[in-house]
Amino acid sequence: MSQKRKLLPAALGLLSLASLSVAAADALSLQGKTIGVALVGTQHFWDREAFKGATEEVEKLGGKVIGVDGGRDNQVHANNHDILLSRKVDAVISILGDSAVEPKFKALRDAGIPVFTVDHVSQYSVNNTTSDNYTLGSTIGRYMADELGGKGNVAVFNAFSSALRICGIRYDQWKYVLKDYPDIHIIQPELAEQFANSPEDARKKTLELLSQYPKGKLDAIHVACWDQPAIGIVQALEETGRDKDVKVTAIDAGPETLEIMAEPGSPFVANVAQQPHLIGQTSADNVARYFAGQKLPVQTFIPVVPVKGPQEAKAVYKQLGYGELQ
């Protein structure tokens, strides 16, 4: 028998498995199910996209959505789960949040309502769907080091690594990579951005930083967990004429920051894009898989998309469905 003929049955077998996988995905259903979707807030594009991805997919699969918005208050977000408990939903998708949600998750589980989380690891969650935060942090560390030629002084905005697990992973991985670059120094103390009106807050803090570190004393500014502060950082650099000697890196690559990166000569040189809509959609799919009796992993990791320079920013902007930049 020829090698080609030996391979044919195996190839047909793989095609059959692939067909079954596609069929299984097509067969997912939430018909007759009511799914609560709890969102910490809608102020940030990431949150809105994840919520949109989850709710649209639930409805596409035939389910009904009850949505609750925490207004970016973690305690309000936590308390909103009581509403979903009282409504006796069939399952809950909870997007973000801090430790305040844990007793609420326990109460839901005790009532027989399965909880699925987005960007929040919990002992009470059936599955957490999230970006690959390890790759996020390590990749931006490598990109920043490359942009600096392996040496320089770096300031970092790092307000949330202690409070939010995802932020801690991103920061720790970034810092871990920098151990291989002994000539890159992190300026102390680190900066702490506010969530509310973060671009303006970061702009003011960057102006203060620049007054303390004249040209030649500061080479980069990194935002450890997200990228909205980077908008204000770039503004401060442009206002002071420091946009040619200080580079900016961050994490998230939302439409606003990709637009800044796409500008010729932008100091915003590297980012790593998440796919929040896909994360929300996948979480909803996992709910349907659960009800179909499928075994789920504890965590589902969604790939991230590294971005370096204007051309890649334009390409990723289009890839993620934000439009097209000239």
Predicted features and spans:
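Short, solvent-exposed amphipathic alpha-helices that sit
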Residues: 46-61, 136-140, 165-186, 201-205, ...
